[in-house]
UniProtKB/Swiss-Prot annotation:
Entries under SMART domains matching the protein: LeuA_dimer
Annotated Pyruvate carboxyltransferase domain residues: 8-278
UniProt-listed NCBIfam families: citramal_synth
EC supergroup of this enzyme: transferase
Gene Ontology biological process terms in this record: isoleucine biosynthetic process; L-leucine biosynthetic process
Cross-referenced PANTHER family: (R)-CITRAMALATE SYNTHASE, ALPHA-IPM SYNTHASE/HOMOCITRATE SYNTHASE
Reactions mediated catalytically: pyruvate + acetyl-CoA + H2O = (3R)-citramalate + CoA + H(+)
Function: Catalyzes the condensation of pyruvate and acetyl-coenzyme A to form (R)-citramalate.
Family membership: Belongs to the alpha-IPM synthase/homocitrate synthase family.
Protein name: (R)-citramalate synthase
Involved pathway(s): Amino-acid biosynthesis; L-isoleucine biosynthesis; 2-oxobutanoate from pyruvate: step 1/3
UniProt source species: Synechocystis sp. (strain ATCC 27184 / PCC 6803 / Kazusa)
Gene Ontology MF terms: (R)-citramalate synthase activity; 2-isopropylmalate synthase activity
């Protein structure tokens, strides 16, 4: 570990910059929920949005005036005044004052190209806009963070002018000067070099509390936003701006879920309290749920696969000493170790899964190698158990002689209609007939559904509910299809993953066949069987029915 270093200030802009990602649209409730979760995580600065830009942001700031956050500073965001306009009559600046926040972030132009062609004003007027805006907000009792937009592009194009914009903000009273890599095109070596030059040019030696401090705001268009942020900090920046899960326009912003653990656990900066760091993974996943985007399973630190081990040698080693293949303990960020089963698995993978499933199994048990051989044979046929652990548990129990079926499907038929009357929209319907045996009794049932898989699922549950009333709570929650050998055309083999739920738990099963309906049937039947096992574990068939 490095020697203990100065505290860093984290600044989250998920609610504004993150919301600019294509596919994200936050409601007022979404924004308030995210803000409160970030507050609980210990983020000191949370940018709420641009007051006056839309009614939702106005309402957001009003709500937080009525019910403030516990610890975090909520920050209002706005641009400098418009060219040749007075600050007192600028509607956007009046709106930012109405937001009632102690801190405000003002962004201004650093690149002469944007001043001359974007704003269509003079370089001198742009400096006046920066100075007037910050001085006015300071006179109104606000503390100011200055975001230097396109800072690194501006510095490369015209270093003297770019530095003049920061010096102007410094003289006007900004407490933080944040260098923004708005286009995301700057590489790590340039970030480090330029940040060092800025600190020296502006005399920011950190010896006086009255000096402004430097910050970094990196975009990920070159895939280096996290690296750029880390190097800026090492070169003297004390504020790091970013978003949860790296959400943001185009390729996104610096990912705070990656930055925070790197800064705190690797570089020994104070960011958030250690006990709060353990909530990082749950925060990442909650926010991905709120924005309705699938979590990145392979995200560093917080991804589902961040501490997943697949190769048999790796698994064996990590069970002896986790640090052989893990750079940190997963629980530090609220994540967990996972042992993945696949054709690359060894006995250690199988034994680890057996322990997880509560199956008594050791290396000397012949079933152990039977399970491993079956696994590799099935994966050769196209099965994949990494995302279908319910099917793998059933496979293991089958090998152990611990899979007494609670029902037996004798057969099924599915009939589909597709009618398109001229006067009506397309009408689609499917009808499934199933024959099931339970405890020696044969049941024939028919059910309709919105498509063949839905109809089959409905018919099976309808047939079994009289024996197992718990099935009424089962629902098919996700259905995924993958063509395994597309070159085979319509005879291609298909893999189907079905996710089921009983309201409390979710589980996934898999089926493979050249017939998509049969693959679906396999996955649906195993899904129902596994759900029943959750509820009737350790009971005989007759006991399960009676209960």
């Amino acid at each position: 570990m490095a020697t203990k270093k100065t505290s860093l200030w984290l600044y989250d802009t998920t609610l504004r910059d993150g919301a600019q990602r294509e596919g994200i649209s936050l409601s007022l409730t979404d924004k308030l929920t995210i803000a409160r979760r970030l507050d609980q995580l210990g983020i000191p600065f949370i940018e709420g949005g641009w007051p006056g830009a839309n009614p939702k942001d106005v309402q957001f700031f009003w709500q937080l005036q009525e019910e403030p956050l516990e610890q975090a500073e909520i920050v209002a965001f706005c641009s400098t005044r418009r060219p040749h306009k007075a600050v007192e009559t600028d509607k956007m600046l009046q709106a930012i004052l109405s937001a009632g926040t102690r801190w405000v972030t003002i962004f201004g132009k650093s690149w002469d190209l944007h001043v001359l062609e974007g704003l269509q004003t003079s370089l001198a007027e742009n400096l006046a806009m920066i100075s007037d805006t910050i001085a006015y907000l300071r006179s109104q009792g606000r503390r100011v963070i200055y975001d230097a937009e396109h800072w690194f592009d501006g510095y490369r194009a015209n270093p003297d002018y770019a530095l003049a914009t920061l010096a102007t903000a410094q003289q006007a009273g900004a407490e933080w000067l944040v260098m923004c890599d708005t286009n995301g095109g700057t590489l790590p070596g340039q970030i480090s070099e330029i940040t060092t030059k800025v600190r020296r040019s502006l005399g920011l030696d950190g010896q006086s509390d009255r000096q402004p401090q430097l910050g970094i705001h990196a975009h990920n268009d070159s895939g280096t936003a996290v690296a750029n942020s880390l190097l800026a900090v090492e070169a003297g920046a004390t504020m790091v701006q970013g978003t949860i899960n790296g959400y943001g326009e185009r390729c996104g912003n610096a990912n705070l879920c990656t930055l925070i653990p790197n800064l705190q656990l690797k570089l020994d900066y104070d960011c958030i309290e250690p006990e709060k760091l353990a909530h990082l993974t749950s925060t990442s996943r909650l926010i991905s749920e709120i924005v309705n985007l699938a979590p990145d399973d392979h995200a560093p630190f917080v991804g589902r696969s961040a501490f997943a081990h697949k190769g048999g040698i790796h698994v064996s080693a990590v069970q002896r000493n986790p640090f052989t293949y893990e750079h940190i303990a997963p629980n530090l960020v609220g994540n967990e170790r996972r042992i993945v089963v696949s054709e690359q698995a060894g006995l250690s993978n199988v034994l680890s899964k057996a322990e997880l499933f509560g199956i008594a199994l050791d290396r000397q048990n012949p079933a152990c190698r039977t399970i491993l051989a079956t696994l590799k044979d099935l994966e050769q046929q196209g099965y994949q158990f990494e995302a279908a652990e319910a099917s793998f548990e059933l496979l293991m129990r089958q090998a152990m002689g611990d899979r007494q079926p609670l029902f037996l499907v004798q057969g099924f038929q599915v009939h589909c209609d597709l009618l398109t009357p001229a006067e009506n929209p397309a009408y689609r319907n499917a009808l499934a007939t199933v024959k099931v045996t339970v405890n020696g009794q044969n049941i024939l049932e028919v059910a309709e559904g919105n498509g063949p898989v839905s109809a089959l699922d409905q018919a099976l549950r309808k047939a079994l509910t009289r024996f197992y009333p718990q099935i009424a709570d089962f629902h098919l929650t996700d259905y995924k299809v993958r063509i395994l050998d597309g070159g085979a055309g319509t005879s291609a083999k298909t893999r189907v993953l079905v996710e089921s739920s009983n309201g409390d738990r979710r589980w996934t099963t898999v089926g493979v066949s050249g017939n998509i309906l049969e693959a679906s049937y396999q996955a649906v039947v195993e899904g129902i069987e596994y759900g029943l096992r959750l509820l009737t574990c350790g009971l005989t068939n007759q006991e399960a029915i009676s209960s």
